[in-house]
Amino acid sequence: MCFLNKKTIFTIMIEHITKGIKISVNTTFNGTSYRRGNLYYDFSYSISIENNSNETVKLTERHWEIFDTLNKTEIIEGAGVIGQTPILNPNDTYAYTSGCFLSSNLGAMKGHYTMINQMNLDKFKVAIPTFQLITPLLLN
């Protein structure tokens, strides 16, 4: 059995713009670990949210779809990101890092943020583009 414990940062940046809100994603493979007696692949992702619109917006909710080639799709929903509900003025950027464990060495994530325009209180969804979670061995 091969154990991968070398942290690998993927330099491919995925970007998407919805209503002037630019989402950029970088992923990192952090190695393998055992949890509850099972082998898991540890991935982290860094997301930058850039407000290129002329409006102030607040990120209120997140919706994730996590695809693992050995398991069913997992849906994660909740308030804000990493315990925060950031407000972004025009030209502001908010960045954070989070992660997930997969049962396999290949997966993907996608989703959306729910934002509220702070001027007119309209809600809208900002797409998070699909990004791959891949171990380095699969890239060879």
Predicted feature locations:
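Terminal connector regions
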Residues: 101-140
